[in-house]
Amino acid sequence: IKWFAKVTTVSEAISAEEAGADVIVAQGMEAGGHKGAFNASDADMNMIGLFSLVPAICDAVNVPVVASGGVADPRGIAAALTLGASAVEIGTGFLRCPEAAISKTWADAIARTKPEDTIVTRAFSGRLGRSIRTKYAVASVSDEAPIPAPYPIQRNLTKTMRDNASKENNLDGMQAWAGQSGSLAQ
């Protein structure tokens, strides 16, 4: 069994390699949903873009590096490989596939979402994640919004709203995770 360690900083990559990781998955801030990091507070503070992160990690470790976050089409794949990645991981780009079984409302929103149409928020779960800029997500980061409870309390507090929004195909209440490049996927 091979161990793939998802990281968001060079120091995490070095620590993962020292701990025995066989492959490092470098996740840039462009990625949708929660960040895969050993230290969530470091990931929140650093927010490093993929094309800065990949070459820095490739230079720092001696195991294969997979680029993740913001890759959704052949141009992104070629760029990541040129920067030294051995492979890429595509997330949001595959959410529009039938096998993902997300709502048509969410899939259609991803198709028309520009990079600036995403937002980073703790509102859904208490952990920082990138979502489509829905009414709830935008309201959650306003100056008047209460500070979200920590994970998993916030996740439990928003469960009914998220479940109902999904049943009703109401994007504005959904946990509509999406990366910044999702609309590039065909």
Predicted features, each with a name:
Residues 8-9, 28-30, 93:
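Short, ordered loop/turn segments at secondary-structure junctions
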Residues 1, 21, 85:
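Short phosphate-binding/catalytic loops that engage adenosine nucleotides
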Residues 1, 8, 13-17, 54-62:
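Surface-exposed amphipathic alpha-helices with a cationic face
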Residues 34-66, 71-186:
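Conserved active-site-proximal phosphate/metal-binding subdomains
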Residues 3-4, 163:
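A short linear-motif detector with a strong N-terminal bias
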Residues 14-29:
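A structural preference for short, pocket-lining loop segments at secondary-structure junctions
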Residues 4-6, 27, 66-68:
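A cross-family glycoside hydrolase active-site/sugar-binding cleft signature
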